């Protein structure tokens, strides 16, 4: 028997050794091929090659084959990676955007930062940085010029709307760190905290916020993680630690390399083990945000309110590369206290399916499978592989514009909710008319009331409507487009003449009238207008304060928080 076991162990070792040898040969073979192919191209291709661009595109194609989170950062892009992890960069502290005429403008300055302090305003058109003409530059190119070493100074020339002369501003770059907590406040007897990202120190910011709100009489806490795409894992663990005991396992990472195997536990005494807690989530709540919401759900410490989260259960780490570059790559999956992994998309399976489709032209059938059931600390059932499902689901009557338009919407939950109601709102938000109206309003109103007291008038709406119509505003009419496509399909298949009467009736129904469409969406348009005005006086904090005045997720959270028996029932207590 011992001889048989020894033989089996020896055979297994040989198989492993053989597999590793084959793998190493394959790696060496294709690296040699890549190197040889590039050298042949460099020598004999009809045009001269730009080595950095050609080879970098090859590297990017390789990383894109894996997942969206594995990214190569050359030396010139390391500032972007640093900003993602720390929230810090050297610059002026303002968001910029491009107008339809291809000029770049100040879009949203941050409070107490160089742009705001020197007097730059929303709508200012950027013309020159020192002697560098910005005409024809993209926003990324202008942004690169605005950033630099803290302490360096430059002269920024701008054209302010409705002024004939240009203005020059002397701006000194500073180390910019966006606050992860743009707003805290009281909603009745509940404390509200908006957390936008998990950067260095954010858990401490939340701690201070909770203490401040409790001093103001908060009997419960609402933590808003909507549109929070995540960030640093250790900050997520430290945040959960505020509400759960010391030495509690929060998340475990598992990967191929031993360095990726790690268990994260709470290291500090908690801030408050008893205060009722609600976590707001949506389909853009991802990564570290899902660790927080998922761990607090698994430990039956908080109710989760909103819509199902994104489902990113992958962990990235950075590896230093030669020539001061870096590779951010996926090294592990994370598992929250119940043992579940909430990663939604299996990228390896996607690659296999794509290969089958490439070879056969057929898409593999999706197999229905039961999701594995896990249990919270109190025995409640939860599942893996689909993000975090809320304990209190809030159904929003909306369809995301990303189904029709492959561009980013907004990273602010309140704005996303509005834009998902109508393509008219989507286009108005991205149109210059909204900024132009906001600039006109700002220039004629030196001050603004407190956010809680601010309202727009019917005349304000009429003024905006007039600016929209005068600007020759156009928006994509998807219903008309889809109807036209359906007509062509019906003609191709020979059904059009039979259904012509119905098609004609639909054409009349779908005929767009801007006046009618705007008036139908007047309340939502006024919310967009209010956000555009408020940011000029009260910055992002004011926008959040205004948005939560009418928020379905917050209303749902408050309903449960104000009902102790329902709160305990949901948590299984």
Name these PLM-found stretches.
Residues 19-30, 34-51, 105-109, 113-122, ...:
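Cleft-lining beta-strand/loop regions that shape enzyme active-site pockets
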Residues 45-105, 153-172, 176-183, 551-558, ...:
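Extended, small/polar residue-biased N-terminal targeting/export presequences
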Residues 341-342, 346-573:
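Conserved functional hotspot residues or short segments at active or partner-binding sites
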Residues 27, 43-50, 65-72, 101-104, ...:
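Short, solvent-exposed loop/turn elements at domain surfaces
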Residues 44-54, 70-75, 221, 251-254, ...:
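Surface-exposed patches in mature extracellular/periplasmic domains of secreted proteins
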Residues 1-27:
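Bacterial Sec-dependent N-terminal signal peptides
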């Amino acid at each position: 028997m011992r001889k048989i076991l020894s033989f089996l162990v020896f055979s297994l070792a040989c198989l492993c050794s053989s597999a590793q040898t084959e793998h190493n040969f394959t790696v060496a073979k294709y690296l040699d091929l890549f190197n040889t192919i590039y050298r042949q191209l460099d020598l004999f291709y009809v045009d001269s090659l730009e080595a950095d661009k050609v080879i970098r595109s090859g590297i990017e194609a390789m990383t894109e084959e894996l997942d969206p989170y594995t990214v190569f950062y050359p030396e010139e892009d390391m500032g972007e990676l640093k900003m993602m992890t720390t929230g810090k960069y050297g610059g002026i502290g303002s968001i910029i955007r491009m107008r339809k005429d291809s000029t770049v403008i100040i879009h949203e300055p941050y409070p107490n930062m160089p742009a705001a302090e020197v007097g730059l305003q929303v709508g200012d058109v950027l013309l020159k940085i020192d002697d560098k003409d910005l005409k024809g530059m993209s926003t990324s190119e202008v942004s690169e010029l605005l950033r630099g070493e803290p302490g360096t100074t430059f002269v920024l020339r701008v054209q302010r709307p409705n002024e004939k002369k240009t203005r020059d501003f002397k701006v000194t770059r500073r180390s910019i760190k966006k606050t992860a907590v743009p707003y805290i406040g009281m909603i009745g007897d509940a404390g509200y905290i908006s957390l936008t990202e998990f950067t260095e120190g954010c858990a401490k910011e939340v701690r201070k916020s909770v203490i401040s709100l409790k001093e103001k009489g908060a009997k419960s806490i609402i933590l808003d993680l909507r549109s929070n795409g995540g960030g640093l894992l250790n900050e997520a663990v430290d945040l959960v630690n505020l509400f759960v005991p010391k030495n509690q396992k929060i998340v475990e990472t598992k990967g191929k390399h031993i360095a990726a195997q790690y268990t994260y536990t709470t290291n500090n005494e908690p801030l408050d083990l008893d205060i009722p807690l609600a976590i707001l989530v949506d389909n853009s709540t991802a990564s570290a945000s899902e660790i927080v919401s998922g761990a607090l759900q698994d430990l039956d410490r908080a109710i989760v309110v909103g819509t199902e989260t994104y489902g990113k259960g992958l962990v990235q780490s950075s590896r230093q590369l030669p020539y001061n570059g870096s590779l951010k790559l996926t090294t592990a999956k994370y598992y929250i206290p119940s043992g579940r992994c909430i990663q939604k998309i299996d990228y390896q399976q996607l690659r296999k399916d794509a290969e089958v489709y490439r070879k056969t032209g057929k898409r593999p059938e999706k197999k229905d499978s039961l999701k594995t059931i896990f249990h919270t600390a109190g025995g409640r059932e939860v599942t893996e592989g689909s993000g975090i499902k809320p304990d209190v689901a809030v159904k929003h009557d909306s369809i995301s514009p990303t189904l029709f338009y492959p561009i980013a919407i907004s990273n602010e939950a309140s704005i996303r909710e509005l834009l998902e109601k109508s393509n008219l709102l989507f286009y108005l938000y991205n149109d210059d008319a909204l900024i132009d109206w906001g600039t006109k309003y700002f220039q004629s109103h030196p001050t603004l009331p407190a956010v809680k007291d601010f309202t727009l008038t019917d005349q304000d709406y009429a003024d905006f409507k007039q600016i929209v119509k005068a600007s020759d505003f156009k928006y994509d009419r998807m219903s008309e487009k889809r109807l036209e496509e359906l007509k062509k399909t019906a003609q191709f298949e020979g059904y059009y003449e039979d259904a012509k009467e119905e098609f004609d009736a639909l054409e009349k129904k779908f005929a767009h009238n801007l006046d009618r469409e705007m008036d139908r969406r007047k309340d939502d348009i006024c919310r967009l207008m209010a956000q555009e005005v408020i940011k000029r006086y009260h910055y992002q904090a004011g926008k959040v304060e205004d948005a939560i005045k009418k928020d379905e997720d917050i209303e749902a959270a408050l309903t449960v928080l104000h009902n102790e028996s329902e709160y305990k029932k949901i948590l299984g207590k």
